[in-house]
Amino acid sequence: MENRWQVMIVWQVDRMRINTWKSLVKYHMHISKKAKGWFYRHHFESRHPKISSEVHIPLETAELVITTYWGLLPGEREWHLGQGVSIEWRQGRYRTQIDPGLADQLIHIYYFDCFSESAIRKAILGHKISPRCNYQAGHNKVGSLQYLALTALIAPKKTKPPLPSVQKLVEDRWNKPQKTRGHRESHTMNGH
């Protein structure tokens, strides 16, 4: 019988970022209690030798599974050192990989109080609204003018430590495009 390959998306992440993610998840599971129902599986509870940890986040009938890996082939840069993260959405027997932005939005919808665009309509109708969003990572678009006005009126409260963001976990801060200086500010360009 021939070998059958299963391909999955694994985001290359440096080890310190994975450690920070694990610490934030454990903090919000056990101390702040904001991550109720989340399940953390340690590396020694997994039968797969490359799995470092798994975080299972229930979403009504589905669940989000964020798996961290170690011992993978080294990445393009020396700081990657074979660490990675995969994000999977599971419902029954159906499984699919999702991107970090969508994962953050799903976590945001199901777990954290939000001062969202529906707050505008609720405020106009005289209903009580949540004063702020506890999970800013779940918002990936610019809101309407009314939404921006309401958020300016009620500033979001920063939580210490921050809530675990999947997008922040896989963010590539090393390969962001460099900002170039303007012509007047560049000392090497004009020889001064």
From Swiss-Prot:
Annotated region described as Multimerization, given as residue ranges: 151-164
Coiled-coil region(s): none
GO biological process: viral life cycle
Site-annotated residues for Cleavage in virion (by viral protease): 150-151
PTM section of the record: Processed in virion by the viral protease.
Binding positions for Zn(2+) per the UniProt entry: 108, 114, 133, 139
Region (Disordered) residue spans: 164-192
PTM annotation (Phosphothreonine): residues: 96, 188
Region (Membrane association): 171-172
Stored InterPro entries: Vif (IPR000475)
Renumbered ranges of motif BC-box-like motif: 144-153
Stretch list, region RNA-binding: 75-114
Localization in the cell: Host cytoplasm; Host cell membrane; Virion
GO molecular function annotations of the record: metal ion binding; RNA binding
Region: Interaction with host APOBEC3G, residue numbers: 40-44
Residues covered by region (Interaction with host APOBEC3F and APOBEC3G): 54-72
Residue numbers covered by motif HCCH motif: 108-139
Positions of the UniProt region annotated as SOCS box-like: 151-180
Ubl conjugation keyword on record: yes
Topological category with respect to the lipid bilayer: Peripheral membrane protein
Other known facts: Vif-defective viruses show catastrophic failure in reverse transcription due to APOBEC-induced mutations that initiate a DNA base repair pathway and compromise the structural integrity of the ssDNA. In the absence of Vif, the virion is morphologically abnormal. HIV-1 lineages are divided in three main groups, M (for Major), O (for Outlier), and N (for New, or Non-M, Non-O). The vast majority of strains found worldwide belong to the group M. Group O seems to be endemic to and largely confined to Cameroon and neighboring countries in West Central Africa, where these viruses represent a small minority of HIV-1 strains. The group N is represented by a limited number of isolates from Cameroonian persons. The group M is further subdivided in 9 clades or subtypes (A to D, F to H, J and K).
Free-text note regarding domains: The BC-like-box motif mediates the interaction with elongin BC complex.
Family, similarity comment: Belongs to the primate lentivirus group Vif protein family.
Job of this protein: Counteracts the innate antiviral activity of host APOBEC3F and APOBEC3G by promoting their ubiquitination and degradation. Acts as a substrate recognition component of an E3 ubiquitin-protein ligase complex: mechanistically, Vif hijacks a host cullin-5-RING E3 ubiquitin-protein ligase complex (ECS complex) and the transcription coactivator CBFB/CBF-beta to form an active E3 ubiquitin-protein ligase complex that targets APOBEC3G and APOBEC3F for polyubiquitination, leading to their degradation by the proteasome.
Complexes and interactors: Homomultimer; in vitro and presumably in vivo. Interacts with viral RNA and Pr55Gag precursor; these interactions mediate Vif incorporation into the virion. Interacts with the viral reverse transcriptase. Forms cullin-5-RING E3 ubiquitin-protein ligase complex (ECS complex) by interacting with host CUL5, RBX2, elongin BC complex (ELOB and ELOC) and CBFB/CBF-beta. Within the ECS complex, Vif interacts directly with host CUL5, ELOC and APOBEC (APOBEC3F and APOBEC3G) substrates.
Name of this protein: Virion infectivity factor
